[in-house]
């Protein structure tokens, strides 16, 4: 990689308190990090005491886990040509003001005479007690807001981690350091954790290499993925509707709701052969949720039109596809452009003949249960007091039933984890929500880096066709103002399930109308602060599950602008990209790729409450500091 500075005294496998720094160097590096991150300098009393009264072996067992993880990663790299490309930096709570023992995996690239280092941060929290709730003042009294480990990873944490990174490379004069990504490790790390260590190292390398492409790609001449790399008549999309109850999992084994999995593959024609092979490129997972959206009952207006046709007056719910994860399959790299490929495939596939509705039909086939759409019968007829069993109905009959209560358009949303394997990449979604920075030069407002990154990815992937259809500066995503708890509970099938199983249909089937209304208000009541809605949602989950669930993190939910998605799909088609859908059951005629976006656009004009954005500040949102943001 041509870097001048590698471990710089941090090569020894054993982790000792003064291994890579003197007290003076650590303080100087900390000040450098604070300047670089734009964060205030802070006093580090605990670190100073521990440094004065230090011992060669720490009582903090987390240090042993950091050592185990580092050893396993170094062992994996021993026989590779990349073993000298990585720096492993231990950030010990006894030496730095960090809440958890942390390992930073560093690597980078050289541009001219300057070294650029990027670090992937792995806080280890196994065995630690949950954080106590934070008291927050609300308009009607104080509330206790739930917290998870990520809530401690604030600007001070970033400063301290960067201080350790700068100390490891010998200071700012030897290069620039940035944080490429962060994933909290909840697993206990032992000598037997080789597979997990390799997985984490792979995630770190992916994040670092993508950070290099984002920050330095133009200077280094690095290639970017686009649709021109795929033969126009070969891409294949397939969709799987999860009927087994088994769910995907994230990098540390937490379940991820995956009712729907969309996979994009490239069909590779074999010369002199009677068969073709497929290379699976990228996949997305998610589920269909419902958002209450009545037809303007307070106004005397005509019938609601979707795609030029009136919808039945009984229609009250907007279907929403919530993307819970996106990840590469047989690709090693995951970049903004390959994410956009997955997004294109997901939109086109689920909109193919309203294929998204098949997920609800699959749930109906299971009969009475927590996600049975037969509960919508109580919406259609007040005299119906219990969910209907639709398992004996045909698919066509169930679909006609759904048409009576659901809008025919699909809202596309994504949950962006505040930390996790690919949170560093998905952070371009919230970064893109803020279109302008607030700076004005002349009469031109400055566009934010996040917006530039997402718009550029849309345009690059479609070979420049997106910019011909969608004006630069128009919205790409909207913040819903909802902080979504991530975690798991023990399902009756004996497996751990994603806490996002708790959705509108779940509440309709398991609880009562008052709880359903309170649940919907916890997402849509813009007169409540985000913290108030989070607390209300937590209280409902606690009641339904009798408190037997564990929260592991947070995600922020964003909606994609339907006009931007329509332009993206049309741009992909103009770029010569055509998808061959496989194992998809059409429920609404032939597949017309642009119809979903057109229907959703019409719906957006008459039901603005779909985008439930609060005008109140998002108090309590984790702020990872400027150094963490690639965009």
Swiss-Prot record:
One GO CC term of this entry?
A: host cell cytoplasm
The answer to keyword Transmembrane helix applying to this record is no
Question: Main localisation, per the record?
Answer: host cell
Q: Which residues form a coiled coil?
A: none
The secretion signal range is none
Q: Does the keyword Electron transport apply?
A: no
Q: Keyword annotations for this protein?
A: Host cytoplasm
Q: Where in the cell is it found?
A: Host cytoplasm
Quaternary structure note? Homotetramer. The tetrameric protomers further assemble as a square grid.
Summary of the function given for this chain in its UniProt record: Self-assembles to form a proteinaceous shell that encloses the viral DNA and compartmentalizes proteins and DNA during viral infection. This micrometer-scale compartment contains narrow pores and is the site of viral replication, with the proteins involved in DNA replication localized inside. Provides a surface for docking of capsids during packaging. Probably protects the viral genome against host defenses.
- What name goes with this protein? Chimallin
What is the scientific name of the source organism?
Answer: Escherichia phage vB_EcoM_Goslar
